[in-house]
């Protein structure tokens, strides 16, 4: 009787765990940080021109600022998805 109640809980827990773990394993990230910046508006211009949703200039403790671009949607990071041809 206990096994019948435990199996659905175990199965649903494994499904949730795998849905959380899959993007981590595949290396997909909702943020792309590269390049130096001096201000958030400058970083935002660079990121939006590249097709990202927004950009934020993050500073570290060593006075080094890096521009981080945030994706509009997750499929933007999937290299296997190509753009449709322009006819």
UniProtKB/Swiss-Prot annotation:
Its main location: secreted. The keyword Cell wall biogenesis/degradation does not apply. One of its GO terms (cellular component) is extracellular region. Residues 1-27 form the signal peptide. Keywords: Antimicrobial, Disulfide bond, Fungicide, Plant defense, Secreted, Signal. Belongs to the DEFL family. This is Defensin-like protein 81.
């Amino acid at each position: 009787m206990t096994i019948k109640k435990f199996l659905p809980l175990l199965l649903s827990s494994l499904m949730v765990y795998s849905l959380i773990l899959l993007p981590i394993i595949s290396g997909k990230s909702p943020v792309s940080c590269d390049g130096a910046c001096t201000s958030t508006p400058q970083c935002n211009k660079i990121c939006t021109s590249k097709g990202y949703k927004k950009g934020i200039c993050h500073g570290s403790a060593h006075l080094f600022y890096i521009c981080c671009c945030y994706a509009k949607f997750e499929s933007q990071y999937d290299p296997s998805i190509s753009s449709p041809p322009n006819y």
